[in-house]
Amino acid sequence: MTANPSYLRTLDHFKVGQVFHHLPHKTVTESDNNLFCLLTLNHHPLHSDVEYARQSQHGRILVVGSYVLSLIVGMTVPDISGTAIANLEYEKVTHDGPVFVGDTLRAETEVLDVRVSKSKPDRGVICVETRGFNQKNERVLTFRRRVLIPTEIPPAYRPYSSE
């Protein structure tokens, strides 16, 4: 068994200004949206009732914004937080545009800051900004987060590492 090498990133793999283009992209399905609504008890008709949505600003069902955030965060895991000790903070979450069933989303992340912890030098914090786009290259989501990253590959990952 081999691990995806991107999951083995430690603090020294991150540089300010570095941009990651995350794969794979994802086409949002009606089932994705419906399941997320059910799991989170979001029963707003804008996300599930075609007739109600037809009368709305966009004229069709809108994908739940918290699903879009969750999906885009998930896309970043292999490159950004695969070895994370913790996600410390999400901030400045902005829904920049609507997402509809059938949209194909992609994400990119820029490293804004990297610092070693003063109290625990075996780890550090990265601050990143992630942007989500649809198939028309329109930005649909932006957020920043701080992630606690180890300075060495965690013991659980060492069997998969070449170090």
Predicted segments, located by residue:
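HotDog/MaoC-like acyl-thioester-processing domains
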Residues: M1-V16, V99-T104, E108-E163
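Hot-dog-fold acyl-thioester-processing enzymes
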Residues: T2-Y90, L141, T151-E163
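Catalytic-pocket segment enriched in acidic/His residues
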Residues: R60, V73-P78, T83-D113, K118, ...
